[in-house]
Design a protein with these regions (language model features):
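Core catalytic region of metal-dependent phosphoesterases/phosphodiesterases
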Residues: 2, 11-107
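Generic beta-strand structural signal
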Residues: 5, 38, 106-107, 203-205, ...
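A structural signal for the main folded, soluble domain(s) of proteins
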Residues: 5, 9, 238-242, 247
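Active-site-proximal loop/helix segment associated with metal-binding centers of metalloenzymes
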Residues: 115-176
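Active-site glycine-centered loops adjacent to acidic/histidine catalytic or metal-binding residues
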Residues: 8, 41, 80, 116, ...
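A short, polar/proline- and glycine-enriched secondary-structure boundary/capping micro-motif
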Residues: 16, 123-126, 242-247
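Residue-level marker for buried hydrophobic side chains located in beta-strands
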Residues: 3-5, 36-38, 113, 194
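Conserved beta-sheet core of the metallophosphoesterase superfamily
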Residues: 93-100, 111, 118, 124-129, ...
Length: 247
């Protein structure tokens, strides 16, 4: 079984280079997988599935995943901090299964926990406060009640607030907290954690024969994680002469 993990593509930002990487990935790499896991922030912003009717680019993204699913690859999509309002209609258009915020999968000898990763950044108190509001059922009802033109205005406001917060917050504050990592892994009884969000791709070997894989974004680091035949490997994308890092 070959499983591929990606996150933080931030599609829809009118970034032609990233869009081209996505198209090539879906054509040349994704069909080789039995399972494809998208662990959040597939889209740069998404404020409700009602946008599908008006967003031709979002529909084209869904079509790529639907084609992949028809060819036999199981597609799983998790919500991120940018596209937290993805819901059943979007997943259905992709031919995908919408994952809960915390998902456990078995990969050979590994019991792995899949997250987007922003919930691990507990040192960033202001962000976690905003996250609780934005992920609440009340905000979902509010967001889904807005007409499309007001959703676009809200999206712009949220992006500006996010950029201002990042500019004024130390990088270490916005990274995953080691205690939060230990707690969530212990709570689920897993030996492997896979997540994105931080844009700091890495493989961390933890105590007790545990490990943590942080996925790359697609604006700076361009890569994906593969599990196959009992081993993990990080592959650069687009492919280069660099050999994949494996364990």
């Amino acid at each position: 079984m070959r499983a591929i993990f990606i996150s933080d593509l931030h599609l829809g930002e009118q970034d032609e280079a990233t869009e081209a990487r996505f198209e090539a990935f879906m054509r040349d790499v994704a069909p080789q997988a039995n399972r494809l896991y998208v662990l959040g922030d597939l889209l740069h912003v998404w404020l409700g599935d009602a946008l599908l009717a008006r967003d031709a680019y979002a529909r084209s993204i869904c079509a790529r995943f639907a084609e992949l699913a028809l060819r036999g690859t199981k597609v799983f999509i998790a919500r991120g901090n940018r596209d937290f309002m993805i819901a059943a209609a979007f997943a259905k258009a992709c031919g995908a299964e919408l994952l809960p915020s915390e998902t456990i999968v078995t990969l050979g000898r590994h019991r792995a926990l899949l997250l987007h990763g922003d919930e691990l950044c507990t040192d960033d108190v202001a962000y976690q406060r905003a996250r609780r509001v934005l992920r609440s059922a009340a905000f979902r009802v509010f967001g889904n009640s807005l007409p499309v033109f007001l959703r676009a205005a809200l999206a712009r406001r949220l992006r500006r607030a996010s950029e201002a917060h990042k500019a004024g917050t130390a990088l270490n504050i916005m990274d995953a907290n080691v205690d939060a990592i230990a707690k969530v892994m212990a709570r689920h009884g897993v030996d492997c954690l896979i997540h994105g969000h931080t844009h700091r791709p890495a493989h961390h070997v933890l105590s007790g024969a545990r490990e943590r894989w942080v996925l790359s974004d697609w604006q700076q680091d361009y890569g994906y994680l593969v599990w196959e035949e009992g081993h993990f490997a990080v592959h650069p994308w687009p492919a280069s002469t660099t050999q994949p890092a494996s364990l």
